[in-house]
Amino acid sequence: VLVKTDGFRQESAAGEQQVICRNATVEDVEPLYLMIEEYAKQGIMLPRSRQALTRQIDQFVIAEIGGKFVGCGSLFRLGSDLVEVRSIGLNDAGKGRGVGSIILEKLTEEARRQKIPKIMALTYAVDFFLRNGFDVVEKEIFPEKVWTDCVNCKKQHACDEIAVLKRLD
């Protein structure tokens, strides 16, 4: 896969289509909404309205192959030293091609650019994050997350997601 992102480029075998990871724009709200809604129906992500996505569009990156939307992810600041990876999702065309790792690398580079030393996620895809340099940690070390999102989650008292953390410093 040939990968092109802002300031990040990786090449592989010829003949494969290019994966482009870029900052999202308001034109991406509908495909973002549809993807997140599908994951939310499966209980994997929290749902987000089109209005919320429009307000938060600058937090998202989009992955495309051949000009077609194949995945997304976002970065949300929880404090001066911590950001959260949110909403990493792929459609069938993006799965099994390393696109999730490309999205995660783009988000990690943005955290580094902002000089934020820690990046976390609550996830069911623990192996994916472990392969990308994260470690499993206790959720309780993230009170910022608990008070911003978990307080509104229906699984608040029976959360089955696993907390992962990567230190960037």
Specify the residue positions occupied by each region the protein language model found.
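C-terminal "cap" of GNAT-fold acetyltransferases
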Residues: L2, F142-D169
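Short amphipathic alpha-helix that is part of the acyltransferase structural core
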Residues: L2-P47, E64, E161-A163, L168-D169
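Short active-site oxyanion
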Residues: V19-I20, R113-I119
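A short helix-loop-beta-strand connector motif used in the catalytic cores of GNAT acetyltransferases and
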Residues: Q51-G66, E84, H157-D160
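Conserved beta-strand in the GNAT
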Residues: I62, K68-R77, D81-G89
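A short, internal acetyl-CoA/4′-phosphopantetheine-binding micro-motif in the GNAT/acyltransferase core
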Residues: I88-K95, Y124-A125
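Conserved acetyl-CoA-binding loop-helix of GNAT-fold acetyltransferases
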Residues: G96-A111, A121
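Conserved active-site alpha-helix within GNAT-family acetyltransferase domains
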Residues: P117, T123-C150
